[in-house]
Amino acid sequence: MLILTRRVGETIIIDDQIKVTVLAVKGNQVRLGVQAPDEIAIHREEIYHRLMNGVGDDAEMEKK
């Protein structure tokens, strides 16, 4: 696992097409912004596991 330190407003780039920006830090929560092509699905981990297990519907899906 790669571990990075970023401050609010700073960005990391993944594979020249995905940008992850730290938008805010409040207590133990971090707000991230993700820019990616439409064909790349983006989910919170817990939602992803539900989708992979066949639980939930489109209303629960979180896409950018």
Swiss-Prot record:
UniProt entry keywords in alphabetical sequence: Activator, Cytoplasm, Repressor, RNA-binding, Translation regulation
Keyword Repressor: yes
This protein's GO CC annotations: cytosol
GO biological process, one term: negative regulation of translational initiation
Primary localization: cytoplasm
InterPro entries hit by this protein: CsrA, CsrA_sf
Pfam family, one: CsrA
Molecular-function annotations in GO: mRNA 5'-UTR binding
Tagged with keyword Ribonucleoprotein: no
Compartment(s) of residence: Cytoplasm
SUPFAM superfamilies for the chain: CsrA-like
Coiled-coil region: none
Protein origin, superkingdom: Bacteria
Subunit structure: Homodimer; the beta-strands of each monomer intercalate to form a hydrophobic core, while the alpha-helices form wings that extend away from the core.
Family statement drawn from the similarity comment of this UniProt entry: Belongs to the CsrA/RsmA family.
Function summary: A key translational regulator that binds mRNA to regulate translation initiation and/or mRNA stability. Mediates global changes in gene expression, shifting from rapid growth to stress survival by linking envelope stress, the stringent response and the catabolite repression systems. Usually binds in the 5'-UTR; binding at or near the Shine-Dalgarno sequence prevents ribosome-binding, repressing translation, binding elsewhere in the 5'-UTR can activate translation and/or stabilize the mRNA. Its function is antagonized by small RNA(s).
Stated name of the protein: Translational regulator CsrA
Organism for this UniProt entry: Dichelobacter nodosus (strain VCS1703A)
Gene encoding the protein: csrA
